């Protein structure tokens, strides 16, 4: 039957009345071998055999009924991963899986035009000069990427996806709240990436009368020679400090945005992989593209500040228009347009992790959602991304700034709670995690402390945030335009609240 095979036991040995039926499976007990040597997961079902032809026919019909849905059959045919949020056992790991794979994946995901566009916000939105923008980019990127590298170690050690791991770190209830937020974040990142690519594609061939409409769209080689780049004036004072904090919040949000994805991409590494090697390889893989792209974006923006023509392109199509101005007119012309298309396509590398993790996060929200194949969640996530990206194209600057800051807020809270649990209550030891409890509500931490910390931290964020739609009472005290300290207040309030309540949760509930 293609996907089904049968083996009859010798009736001269014990348990000879058992018949073994092998069918592909993504649930229950699995083993990664197949009778034809393919990579199909198989489930063994034992049935009593009366050695009659009728029973053989019944076994065949029963096995056919247990075959995979057509989605998973297709995924199996394409050699795609179909495993859900269940822990990845040591026997399922890939002995050839290298830290270079994870490091290069994050390198590709961040060497994209969205990071470049974010760097341009420093001079264009926050009125910072190039030197100040570079310092902010380096410091806040380091602050944001360290949790990503650190939580990647957990995936290799425990074999748990990040949102399932969160049940141990945040508590069961809190983890499901963050799983929902993570689904929203996956779509949001996809929108941000798609928007800036659409803006760039919109500029290609725009002088020929055949420009690509904005909704359908879904590097500086000559700055020094053109004399359009300058460092800008060094300024100080409360207003500059406020702008530094606000730009830093956006940078931090971009860098740390992968924190709730981290363990998803190391679960197939052998457990004995050197943990220091994982950490520092990922730090390198994350830091270089983030530094390079954002600093390049800041330099490009400084050129727009000094050149009226470039500024006009920027005003028309934001960073996409500015990139076109640098690469095409009076520069590389046709080849420059080709480069613009390549840059726009870099979005694919950034969106792959989003659409991979969105399915795992959706399944982690609720048990019933785990029964829906991952491919369905991924398709739904892509559809939502397109639907939101189209209107967001026309309001990119405000959307990107607000979204990045919002991501930074909730991830700072997540990191503060998770690190508290691991270092204080689990004594920085992986031996204090019982992986078998991953889906047992009676044994997992309830999440009282985590939920309380999240709620209290939200008030801290509200007091410290500085957005076009809301300026907190504390943030408005910093400079003329306010300074965003929402993620700092959120993290600190979450840490304090969690460590006040968590001991009582352990004392009275024992978990």
What name fits each language-model region?
Residues 99-116, 220-224, 234-303, 330-355, ...:
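Hydrophobic, membrane-embedded alpha-helices of multi-pass small-molecule transporters
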Residues 3-130, 221-225, 243-249, 267-277:
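Membrane-interface "cap" regions at the ends of multi-pass membrane proteins
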Residues 175-210, 344, 348-364:
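Hydrophobic transmembrane alpha-helices that form the core helical bundles
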Residues 70-170, 174, 260-269, 273-287, ...:
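Transmembrane helix-boundary motif of multi-pass solute transporters/channels
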Residues 123-135, 204-216, 335-339, 369-380, ...:
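Transmembrane helix-loop boundary segments of multi-pass membrane transporters
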Residues 213-216, 348, 364-397, 439-461:
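Loop-to-transmembrane helix boundary motifs in multi-pass membrane proteins
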Residues 296-350, 368, 389-397, 401-405:
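TM-loop-TM module centered on a large, flexible mid-protein loop between adjacent transmembrane helices
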Residues 415-496:
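C-terminal membrane-solvent junction of multi-pass transporters and transport-like membrane proteins
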């Amino acid at each position: 039957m293609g996907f089904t095979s049968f083996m009859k036991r010798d009736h001269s040995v014990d348990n000879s009345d058992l018949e073994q039926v092998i069918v592909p499976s993504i649930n229950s007990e699995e083993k990664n071998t197949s009778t034809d040597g393919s990579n199909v997961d198989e489930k063994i079902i034992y049935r009593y055999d009366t050695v009659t032809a009728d029973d053989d026919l019944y076994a065949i019909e029963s096995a056919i009924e247990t075959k995979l849905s057509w989605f998973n059959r297709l995924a199996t045919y394409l050699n795609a991963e179909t495993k859900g949020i269940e822990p990845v056992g040591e026997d399922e790991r890939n002995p050839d899986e290298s830290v270079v794979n994870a490091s290069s994946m994050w390198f590709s995901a961040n060497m994209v035009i969205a990071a470049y566009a974010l760097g341009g916000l420093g001079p264009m939105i926050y009125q910072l000069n190039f030197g100040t923008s570079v310092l902010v980019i380096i410091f806040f990127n380091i602050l944001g990427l360290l949790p990503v590298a650190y939580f990647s170690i957990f995936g290799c050690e425990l074999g748990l996806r990040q949102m399932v791991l969160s049940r141990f770190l945040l508590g069961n209830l809190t983890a499901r709240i963050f799983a929902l937020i993570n689904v929203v974040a996956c779509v949001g990142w996809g929108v941000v990436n798609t928007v800036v690519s659409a803006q760039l594609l919109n500029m290609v061939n725009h002088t020929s009368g055949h420009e690509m409409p904005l909704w359908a769209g879904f590097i500086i080689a000559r700055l020094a020679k053109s004399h359009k780049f300058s460092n800008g004036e060094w300024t100080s004072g409360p207003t500059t400090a406020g702008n530094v904090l606000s730009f830093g919040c956006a940078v931090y949000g971009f860098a740390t945005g992968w924190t709730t994805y981290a363990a998803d991409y190391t679960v197939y590494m052998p457990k004995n992989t050197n943990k220091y090697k994982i950490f520092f390889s990922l730090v390198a893989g994350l830091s270089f593209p983030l530094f390079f792209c954002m600093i390049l974006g800041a330099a490009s923006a400084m050129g727009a500040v000094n050149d009226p023509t470039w500024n006009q392109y920027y005003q028309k199509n934001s960073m996409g228009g500015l990139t076109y101005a640098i690469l095409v007119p009076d520069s590389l012309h046709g080849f420059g347009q080709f480069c613009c298309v390549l840059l726009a396509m870099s979005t694919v590398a950034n969106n792959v992790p989003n659409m991979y993790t969105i399915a795992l996060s959706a399944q982690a929200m609720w048990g019933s959602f785990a029964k829906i194949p991952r491919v369905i969640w991924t398709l739904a996530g892509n559809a939502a991304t397109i639907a939101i990206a189209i209107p967001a194209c026309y309001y990119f600057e405000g959307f990107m700034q607000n979204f990045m800051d919002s991501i930074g807020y909730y991830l700072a809270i997540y990191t503060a709670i998770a690190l508290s649990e691991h270092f204080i209550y689990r004594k920085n030891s992986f031996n204090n995690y019982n992986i078998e409890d991953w889906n047992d509500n009676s044994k997992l931490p309830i999440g009282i402390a985590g939920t309380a910390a999240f709620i209290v931290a939200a008030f801290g964020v509200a007091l410290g945030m500085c957005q076009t739609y809301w300026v907190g009472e504390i943030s408005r005290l910093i400079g003329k335009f306010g300074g965003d300290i929402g993620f700092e207040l959120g993290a600190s309030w979450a840490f304090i609240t969690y460590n006040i309540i968590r001991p009582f949760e352990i004392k009275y509930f024992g978990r």
